[in-house]
Amino acid sequence: MHLVAGDSPGSGPHLPATAFIIPASSATLGLPSSALDVSCFPREPIHVGAPEQVAGCEPVSATVLPQLSAGPASSSTSTVRLLEWTEAAAPPPGGGLRFRISEYKPLNMAGVEQPPSPELRQEGVTEYEDGGAPAGDGEAGPQQAEDHPQNPPEDPNQDPPEDDSTCQCQACGPHQAAGPDLGSSNDGCPQLFQERSVIVENSSGSTSASELLKPMKKRKRREYQSPSEEESEPEAMEKQEEGKDPEGQPTASTPESEEWSSSQPATGEKKECWSWESYLEEQKAITAPVSLFQDSQAVTHNKNGFKLGMKLEGIDPQHPSMYFILTVAEVCGYRLRLHFDGYSECHDFWVNANSPDIHPAGWFEKTGHKLQPPKGYKEEEFSWSQYLRSTRAQAAPKHLFVSQSHSPPPLGFQVGMKLEAVDRMNPSLVCVASVTDVVDSRFLVHFDNWDDTYDYWCDPSSPYIHPVGWCQKQGKPLTPPQDYPDPDNFCWEKYLEETGASAVPTWAFKVRPPHSFLVNMKLEAVDRRNPALIRVASVEDVEDHRIKIHFDGWSHGYDFWIDADHPDIHPAGWCSKTGHPLQPPLGPREPSSASPGGCPPLSYRSLPHTRTSKYSFHHRKCPTPGCDGSGHVTGKFTAHHCLSGCPLAERNQSRLKAELSDSEASARKKNLSGFSPRKKPRHHGRIGRPPKYRKIPQEDFQTLTPDVVHQSLFMSALSAHPDRSLSVCWEQHCKLLPGVAGISASTVAKWTIDEVFGFVQTLTGCEDQARLFKDEARIVRVTHVSGKTLVWTVAQLGDLVCSDHLQEGKGILETGVHSLLCSLPTHLLAKLSFASDSQY
């Protein structure tokens, strides 16, 4: 049609503009049955001249109805294609009019086309699914949706605009001038437009033109919840209806709330975005300058190119002198979680991608080092090429390793040279040490005649190493090697002559200046209890070469000392620049994770639990405030659900990984062909150094009463309170054995071996088991039995007590064993405890 500017014809031609009138229903049109492409319709020729006039001098415009097919054959044609949807507005081809899809009007005319401002242009259009309310035409008519009001609901919490000429967008916030070309501020917002786009779908035989322009409701992505929180579909629909305001509109939401984030709790509560800038302003604090950090601690320009499954060689943190085959088990930012091939995940450890402790495959052969093969492989038969083929794995490329920089070796330090070094685990002690390995610019310090668990790598400027004779000059005691014949009269000259070694020259040692960290400076540090996490931390205290780390918001019981050049501390912003998640400080009002809800997110990559999970304990939450359930105090598992496994619980501070993984660790050490820990007899008269092996407890065995032995070894599992008397436990077991209800506990306590033998034979009907108990019990009564034999005998009795065949009479049998132990002399009980500690 032609638009006429006025009712007079005018002498000059009018600028034409083309528009399409979309009927409310295609049923009123005589539409052809064949499908025609909209682009094939010839445009109406432009007539320059006066329009037709009718009575009243009212201009009449010719109406052009495009031929639209509603038949099934028109699957590729829809009325949406009549408009060119560019960004938030849709101008018709060749025209200046613009149509806009607003939040409450499916299609309205916005005015003459004007180029949008660069600030409002957004790339990409989000597609939405069908399911919106009925649409009307460009004007508000009877086809207006019932559940969509004509005007947007007023928000009582929203401040009114300052004047009539400006209005504020509900989505993005900035004020814009209101005008006919922009409609409302919400209409011109590209953010809302991307949330209210229209998809082009195939039209069916019953689909009308108006139905094709329905505003589509964006279906909110369902948040992952635990099985205990998930409901059935009808319940979910009811809650969705409850989430609307009284006028039927859904409550306001942001893109952040609509996108699932695994870092958010399963309850759907959104945490405020944390930033260093706002936190520093709030705390009135400063961050540690980047200049205080080493290159290995600061942000690197190299990208972490390691991928999951890549294999490499690396140093065992627990045995720094040994090299193992490792596999990249996890990549997080610029950090790696490495796994020992053939061993349990409880030995996994984290390193930075630029760590000098990792090397490419084949490095040990070129450098002459010894590589420990995976569990089950023989050292002489191991081959990298064959191993990669058998595991179908890929070796990490050499260019990813910083160790390939070929740094020059430290001058003056050679393998076998002697020096004095500080024991890192006992910093008050300085011991006789040797250089046992040199790699690039670092060397390995080993304490003479000790195992390699106390070795550490350092460089010539380390403050923990000193030249020979340093302790004598400083007036400090020097701890001689283990097994040294005369430790009180240790002499360096004599020791060097005996070992045929030489001392590291004094000029080879470099002096490292003290660090410049100050108290209360902010930084980012790895949580030693859960090494997968990096937290916001502060400098609590300083020494010349160490700093004390405190995690903001946490108790000071988690503070620890760390070297100022340790790779586990980073400047503020390191996580954001490397893509690693940062754990914000624990706020004073942050609720405990023990609040009701589903399973906590185990990590930033956690997946939702299945609906059919039947283990209710899995949906518990750790009661430690601020703990999200990730990690485990033993290092064996990636998650925990109770306080006993929480690595952040104060009562678990003294627990070590090795205490609960002795079996795995022992099996791992047995497979190490190149590691045989030497036997070290006790050394009396040495200088102050605590032994590096397990001490045999020296308790006063006179205090070990038979009751204590009974409660520690043979207390019934049915007794929930070990401090109860024996008679109470007897009453519990009598409930399982109605036939002995008339026998009192005091009577059983006085039974002889033969009486217990008869009871066991009657109970089980097996004379062999009864005779076994009788024979073993008589052996215990031998006064001149050795400690190991005594332990073995009592262990046999314990196995008999725990036998499946004797579960019914377990309480009575325990009472009989207790009576047997009570009859033992005190020195035999001492032997029992001593031998138990020695053997186990």
Curated annotation (Swiss-Prot):
One Gene Ontology CC term in the entry: chromatin
Annotated site (Mediates recognition of monomethylated and dimethylated peptides): D423
Biased composition (Basic residues): 677-695
UniProt-reported outcome of changing D423N: Strongly impairs binding to monomethylated and dimethylated peptides. Abolishes binding to p53/TP53 monomethylated at 'Lys-382'
UniProt-listed InterPro entries: Mbt, MBT_L3MBTL1_rpt1, MBT_L3MBTL1_rpt3, PcG_chromatin_remod_factors, Znf_C2H2C, Znf_C2H2C_sf
Pfam families in alphabetical order: MBT, zf-C2HC
Extra remark beyond the main annotation: The L3MBTL1 locus is imprinted. Paternal inherited gene is expressed, while the maternal inherited gene is silenced.
Subunit structure as annotated in this protein's UniProt entry: Homodimer. Interacts with RB1/RB (when monomethylated at 'Lys-860'). Interacts with p53/TP53 (when monomethylated at 'Lys-382'). Interacts with CBX3, ETV6, KMT5A and VCP/p97.
Record remark: domains: The MBT repeat 2 specifically recognizes and binds monomethylated and dimethylated proteins. In contrast, it does not bind trimethylated proteins. The MBT repeat 1 does not bind methylated peptides but inserts a proline ring in a Pro-Ser-Ser/Thr sequence context.
Record's protein name: Lethal(3)malignant brain tumor-like protein 1
Organism field: Homo sapiens (Human)
Top-level taxonomy: Eukaryota, Metazoa, Chordata, Craniata, Vertebrata
